[in-house]
């Protein structure tokens, strides 16, 4: 059973009533599935809705490499200066205006049993109440613990740049296991789109690469050992486990947090003399050059989450709304990029800014590989007669990876 319309808004926060009054979820057609539509005029720059995820989890390699984040909400735990020191590889790196760092270490708390860290007592209690009682391994760091074996197996088959985590699936199961009203949570998770068997296989192949059938069988065995739940018995069959992978692979919204970026934004808001502004901007530019030289592109604490209302937003290469995480945790904001009229569909982009500037052929390649659909937004329709050309680098990637086999492609996005 799909989630009710009431359930769709149940994780909205802050302006939840505003969201109910300004948007609605409609069934579009058999290709697009659901979509989110404005019911009143939404002005450019307005926050359309703010939403918490059903579940979220930090990527496992990201956590292993000491990107320290709250185990529940993914808020960055390092002070901005500590963050800069680690990313530049310079223990003596000093930041000006340290008072602009928003990290409150005095509020941090850890689980008294397994010692995972939280940004606050509220997050520690929220995790314990929702899923952590099931997932807490206790004081033992025994690599033979079922959850430790599961995480190690995942890291061995899914390398950076990461796009999903087996622990997001684990938290889904643990949430249902701990819940008094199990049907409520199953209904919420069933809200996310379903795929055909061939589409699911293509998504699993994308996530696991290589001998994905053997890897999927290994992960399923460890998943059963660690988390089996009778109420979710279908998820523990080969077909159900593959469906769970496809759900997470196509519906997981990436989350990124950084105490350093928060500090930079605070610096941008300072009222300074032109000379001081130039000096500070030069310092920050050099800092990011040093970070790029030492660390490359991996700057943030990274993870993913499942958002019910946001998942109703379909894709467009010319979106009229965007997602962001301005609170430096897993709370998602959807903001209008232009005026949106009543009855108009609210679309976000699943591509980043650079990807959206690529050719139609390149955009479709990315969307097919990651979401199994061909876009028919106004930009793609306008470029339909353009030649199918792409860069030499992408052609080399095509030769190395190949296109997903047996994937059934939709003409448009389906509820991701």
From Swiss-Prot:
GO terms for molecular function: histone H3K36 trimethyltransferase activity; histone H4K20 methyltransferase activity; histone H4K20 trimethyltransferase activity; protein-lysine N-methyltransferase activity; zinc ion binding. Pfam families: SET. It is found in: Cytoplasm. One of its GO terms (cellular component) is cytoplasm. Ubiquitinated and degradaed by the proteasome in response to mild hypothermia (32 degrees Celsius), relieving repression of the SP1 gene. InterPro entries: SET_dom (IPR001214), SET_dom_sf (IPR046341), SMYD5_SET (IPR044422), TPR-like_helical_dom_sf (IPR011990). It is an enzyme of class 2 (transferase). A zinc finger (MYND-type) spans 98-136. CDD domains: SET_SMYD5. GO terms for biological process: methylation; negative regulation of gene expression, epigenetic; positive regulation of cytoplasmic translational elongation; regulation of stem cell differentiation; regulation of stem cell division; transposable element silencing by heterochromatin formation. Disruption phenotype: Mice develop normally and are fertile. Conditional deletion in the stomach inhibits malignant progression in a mouse model of gastric cancer. Residues 383-416 are annotated as: Disordered. Its EC number is 2.1.1.-, 2.1.1.372, 2.1.1.359. Keywords: Cytoplasm, Metal-binding, Methyltransferase, S-adenosyl-L-methionine, Transferase, Ubl conjugation, Zinc, Zinc-finger. Protein-lysine N-trimethyltransferase that specifically catalyzes trimethylation of 'Lys-22' of the RPL40/eL40 subunit of the 60S ribosome, thereby promoting translation elongation and protein synthesis. May also act as a histone methyltransferase in the context of histone octamers, but not on nucleosome substrates: trimethylates 'Lys-36' of histone H3 and 'Lys-20' of histone H4 to form H3K36me3 and H4K20me3, respectively. The histone methyltransferase activity, which is independent of its SET domain, is however unsure in vivo. Belongs to the class V-like SAM-binding methyltransferase superfamily. Interacts with the N-CoR complex. Interacts with EHMT2 and CBX5. This is Protein-lysine N-trimethyltransferase SMYD5.
